[in-house]
Amino acid sequence: MPSATPVIPSQQTAIVAEGAGQLSIYHDAPVPALQPDVALVKTAAVAINPVDAKMLDYSPVPGAIHGYDFAGTIVALGSDTPPHLKVGDRVAGFVHGMNPLLPDVGAFAEYVAASADLVLKLPDTMSFEEGASLGLGLFTAGLGLFQHLQIPLSLTREPSPEASSPTKADFVLVAGGSTATGTRALQLLKLAGLRPVATCSPAHFDLARRFGAEAVFDYHDPDCAAAIRAYTKNTLAYALDCLALAETTQLCYGALGRAGGRYVTLEPFREAIAAQRPHTVTPSWLLALTIFGRKVALDGEYGREANPEDREFGARLTEQVQGLLDEGKVDVHPVRVMGGGWQGVLEGVDLVRRQTVSGHKLVYAV
């Protein structure tokens, strides 16, 4: 007999922002309405990201549900959702948590209203806890590499053979290669047939190599940029900065080859550094939230108008990554599964705020 249609309540347990740095557990938060393009997901696990603490501290939205990364089971589908999805599918993705325009949507809740064309079906071999680590890092890396750096999106090419005289397009630098976004970027680049090189601390060299880095450099080394230039034979034309620090901007600019290229980071960059190579390096910074194709109602330079092109790109990226997941080609960033349920999630946001997490992602079964 077919399974019964899940009963969806009108209220749920969720973690809601109350003010700057303040979250509380509500047991009467509204379950988001089912929109035509939405997959409503019963949450099984959530992951903590640095942005969870950052946005809460600097751009809180009182009354809004927080959280970005989730995994769970589809319990309802809107009228305009991809035909390959069905109720009962195990999926993962990310949402714009603590969104002033959609305050009922956030990952830290029993039910998540996710953009259906941006969710990934999990293979049977991947747990919810592992799947919860995919979303934000994956889409941030993809947006940076294939939209901002303008590397062609093709995750089905065979890796290029080692060449004694690499072409301009061979090498891509990932600064912060051991971060969740960095490991995603390294893996996507390797699958795209490119030659990723990375910077991170020596303690995480093996992690970066595991995800595809051809060479890894210690970003603490004062000669790091020169070493990268030497390794890439002064041809490096692409740099993705996952740390978004003044020092890493300087490092990336120093590592790019003589002809210059493109630099993209995850935060506003230092104009003084960018001015050092104004005619040869094109800098930009990305906000992963544009991938939903909706207006991003944040203050100052973080606010963005709706960008339908990023939404279309996100759907294409999802489709290609889904194929890789189905083939077992996607490895997951190391996760540390924590206990405590929703209370544990509150504590996890504070752990990330205090920068005590390195080389793995905190994940909570809920």
From Swiss-Prot:
Belongs to the zinc-containing alcohol dehydrogenase family. Coiled coil: none annotated. Residues 19-363 form the Enoyl reductase (ER) domain. One of its GO terms (molecular function) is enoyl-[acyl-carrier-protein] reductase (NADPH) activity. NADP(+) binds at residue 219. Keywords: NADP, Nucleotide-binding, Oxidoreductase. Trans-enoyl reductase; part of the gene cluster that produces the acyltetronic acid derivatives carlosic acid, agglomerin F and carlosic acid methyl ether. The PKS domains of caaA condenses two malonyl-CoAs into an acetyl starter unit, and form 1,3-diketohexanyl-ACP with the help of the trans-enoyl reductase caaB. Next, the C domain of caaA forms the ester bond between the acyl chain and L-malic acid (derived from the TCA cycle) and accepted by the A domain instead of an amino acid. Monomer. Pathway: Secondary metabolite biosynthesis. SMART domains: PKS_ER (SM00829). Induction: Expression is positively regulated by the cluster-specific transcription factor caaR. InterPro entries: ADH-like_C (IPR013149), ADH-like_N (IPR013154), GroES-like_sf (IPR011032), NAD(P)-bd_dom_sf (IPR036291), PKS_ER (IPR020843), Trans-enoyl_RdTase-like (IPR047122). This is Trans-enoyl reductase caaB. PANTHER family: HYPOTHETICAL OXIDOREDUCTASE (EUROFUNG), TRANS-ENOYL REDUCTASE APDC. Its EC number is 1.-.-.-. It comes from Aspergillus niger (strain ATCC MYA-4892 / CBS 513.88 / FGSC A1513). The keyword Ligase does not apply. The keyword NADP applies.
